[in-house]
């Protein structure tokens, strides 16, 4: 990994506890009455103590029966972290491609894409039958490796050199993505992520990050 080079590039954000202030799976678990059990597994997964794929399947299984319509409660309004809209708008105005690569769920990611006008989103799809969660995930699980692969694929699609890519995340599932990017940003992150990041960004307000990245362009 190297510091960001000149001109606009591609920035990939994690979703839960990065673009938004909540862990969606924990809040769905609250609707299902099992938040404490799910939150403990989420915390262990974000520290990197347990396998992400296995932990996700176990947690999602506990969500079986939750009505799809209740998910909307979690996004009324969307719980953005401070400065998110300003950060992304500033980068977009400077010509950047902005994407979301998440081990969370498409139900939420697609709503963020619409709200923020993101260029692409990649996330896990919850299986829903008869208006309720089944407790299963459809298709492949978006884990750390998939995030890194998607970052590279999107950079190639838009003909953006890896040196002009940035990845922003907070947990162990973001590690490979940060390592794959030209610049890895650990946002209010777990210690394991801080150890490998190029930038440790410890303030909640993300608006200053856009300025920092754009300034790096001007100086390069």
Say what each PLM segment does:
Residues 2-126:
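Alpha-helical substrate-recognition element adjacent to the catalytic core
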Residues 1-2, 220:
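Basic/polar N-terminal segments that are highly enriched at the extreme N-terminus
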Residues 75-98, 103-220:
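C-terminal cap/substrate-recognition subdomain and adjoining C-terminal extension
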